[in-house]
Amino acid sequence: MPITVNKLRHDTHHFFYKKIGAIFFISIFATFMNILIDMFIKPDMHIVSIMENNKFINTSSLLEFIQNMNLNEKHELLKYSILKIMESLISKTTLLGSIIILISVVSEPKKKSIVSSIRTFFLFFPSLFILNFLTTFIIQIGFMLLIIPGILLSIILSLSPIILFFKKNRLLDSIRLSMYISWKYIKIIGPGVLFWMCGKFILTMLLAHFSLINKNVLFLISNISMNILFSILIIYLFRFYMIFLRS
């Protein structure tokens, strides 16, 4: 079966509208999990206010800001940053794992029970979390160097969570295969990832102009919308990999 962008777009559109209720529920659940973790973190409000009120133009301005901190403030900033990274990874892994399990359950001819699906999710979660940490770290290094390497790394590593699901806990193999397959089919994988990135950018720009809306409500809308966008990307990539395995 030939793999085309139009075919994947049609299949993604069909699956999204068929399972729109479940996707919305997962997106909302991941958002509320993010909020709950944020409540338990309880960071130093002085550090949070400093971070929110300072607009860093570049890396040097951020480094200068950190250098002017006292030792206690640096320690609190480090702790806050680590906790926020963990929060983001847990939320992303929950969303990613849930959507992958949802697609796999719907795609299988033999229907799985809810208990079986939850069990699969919890078995999959630890390895997916580690993979997310590794790929996020690699991609962020790419963005720190230049924008183009960051985008390219986002594309070639995008299949790794889906390959991991099929390969069953083989992290390095998942990353290696993702790089090989995504590079070979970059004209098909690329548009999906770029659509997601552009969607995130446009959504961020639009929501930034809604200054009259309550900050917490805006955060909720933003997170749910971003989660839905990411879910669409995962559906697109999962469908690609299913067709790839059959071809």
From Swiss-Prot:
InterPro entries: UPF0259. The chain crosses the membrane at residues 20-40, 85-105, 114-134, 137-157, 188-208, 218-238. Keywords: Cell membrane, Membrane, Transmembrane, Transmembrane helix. GO terms for cellular component: plasma membrane. Its main location: membrane. Disulfide bonds: none annotated. The keyword NAD does not apply. It is found in: Cell membrane. It holds the Pfam family UPF0259. It comes from the Bacteria. It is a multi-pass membrane protein. The keyword Cytoplasm does not apply. Belongs to the UPF0259 family. This is UPF0259 membrane protein BU276.
